[in-house]
Amino acid sequence: MRRYSALPGGGARPDTLADRLHRYRGVLLVILAPLALVSLVLLLMPRSPASSSAAAGRRWGPLDANKYAVIFDAGSSGSRVHVFRFDANLDLLHIGDQIELFVQKKPGLSEYANNPQEAAKSLVSLLEDAKRVVPVELRGQTPVRVGATAGLRALGAEKSEEILQAVRDLLREKSSFKTQPDWVTVLDGPQEGAYEWVTINYLLGKLGKTYADTVGVVDLGGGSVQMAYAIAEKDAVKAPKPSEGEDSYVKKLFLKGTTYYLYVHSYLHYGLLAARAEILKAGNGKGYSYCTLEGHQGQYKYGNGKFEASASPSGASYSKCRDDVVKALKVDQACTHMKCSFGGIWNGGGGAGQKNLFVASFFFDRAAEAGFVNPKAPVAKVKPSDFEKAAKRACKLNLKDAEAAYPGVQKDNIPYICMDLVYQYTLLVDGFGVGSHQEMTLVKKVPYSNAFVEAAWPLGSAIEVAS
C-alpha cells in the first residue's frame, strides 16, 4: 500500500524521496557503513606491481607475461651469454637474485679459425647455463641470438661463415630455444655500436628524451672500437656519403616515441688487442718496440698474424711509444669531410649528444688494473689525463717490477700495459678529440632497478628481438 503524508488543509500527498530516506536512515546506515569501510581499506592498501596476467593482457598472452631473450656475445677476447627477462612493458625483471644471467669464458670463437666444430662446442656450457634459468614452458618461444664481433670479422668471410654455420647447427640440434639462421651472424660495427648506445641510454632512463639529454658511448672491444652519439636532424642530413664498402655514418632510430639520428662508426683493427698489432707494425722498422716493457722478448700473436714485440734495449718510452701510436692511428691522414677523427673518418660533427661521454669495456678494465679506479665499482668518473699519468708510470717499469706493481693484470698482458694505456689516452685525445681534462664516465655496469646491468651491446639486441 502506498503511504501518503498529510497536505496542508487536510489533503494527502505522496511520500517524497527525502521522506523515505529519512524514515529508513537507520537501515541504510547499517548497509553502507561496512561498504565504505571496505572501500577505504582497498584505497589505502599499497599498490603491488601488476600481476603477470594483468601485465600479459596489455601486450602478450598470459603465458608470455615474462619474456626471455638469450644473447651470445662472441667477441675477440672471449664468448659471453646474457639472459634477460622482461615484463609486458619491456622493463627488466630479476632472474633469481640478479637482474640478468651473465656468464663468460675464454677463448673467443676466432681462436678456432681452423676448427669450426670446436668453435661451436665452446658455446655448449654457456648454452646449458642459459637453459637452467629459462622455464621449460617458455624455452620454445625464447629467442636465442649469437652476435659475433670484430674477432670473427677479422677472419674473413669464408672462415667466419664456416664457424657461424657450425653454431647454427649446434643451436638447431642441441637447443630448445627459438632460433633462426639470420640470428647467428657477424654484427657489423655500426650495429654493435648502435646496440651499445641503446643499452646504456635505456638503463639510464634517457630514451624518450631529446637527443641533447642522451649520452655518447665509446666502446673499446678487443678487435674494434665504436663511437656512437645522437646528433641533430640538421646535422644528420649533412652527413657525408660513405666511401664504397663503408657503412653509413647515421642510423635513424625510433625509441619510446622519439626519433633519434645516431652517428655511429666502428673502427676495425682499433680495438685494444688489434691495436697492439697496428702499433707494433707502425714501429716495425726498428726490430723492437718502445711500447713493450724492458725485459720482454718475443712476438705478439693476433688473429693469424705474428708481430715482433721485443722491448727496446733501453726499455719502454712513453713519448716514443706515443709517436708510434699516433702513427698507427693515422691521425694526420687527409680529411675530405667537415671534421674527422682519425684515418680520414668523419667524426659526426660533435654537439650536445657527445658532451656527456660514457666509455666502456677495456677502458674500464685497464683503468681498474692500473689502480686509478676501484675495480669493484660499477661506474667511475675519470679524465683522459688519468690514463696519461698511469701510462707514464707504467712505461718506466721493467717486466719484473710491473708484475709486482699490477697484480690484477694477467701475465700475458703485463708486457703491453704501457702500450695499452698510451693507446687509450691517445685514442681519446688525438683520435676522438676529447679534452685531456674533460670528465667522462667509465662504465662496467649501470645501476638499474636496485641492481647493476652489464654495459654491453647484447641488451640492445635483446630489446629489439623482444619488442
UniProtKB/Swiss-Prot annotation:
Residue ranges that the UniProt entry lists as topological domain Extracellular: 47-467
Membrane topology label: Single-pass type II membrane protein
Biological process, per Gene Ontology: nucleoside diphosphate catabolic process
GO MF entries: apyrase activity; ATP binding; nucleoside diphosphate phosphatase activity
Binding site for ATP: 70-80, 216-226
Catalytic reactions of this protein: a ribonucleoside 5'-triphosphate + 2 H2O = a ribonucleoside 5'-phosphate + 2 phosphate + 2 H(+)
Cofactor needs: Ca(2+)
Cytoplasmic side: 1-25
One Gene Ontology CC term in the entry: membrane
InterPro entries xrefs: GDA1_CD39_NTPase
This protein's UniProt keywords: ATP-binding, Calcium, Hydrolase, Membrane, Nucleotide-binding, Signal-anchor, Transmembrane, Transmembrane helix
Main location: membrane
Family: Belongs to the GDA1/CD39 NTPase family.
This protein's name: Probable apyrase 2
Organism: Oryza sativa subsp. japonica (Rice)
Gene coding for it: APY2
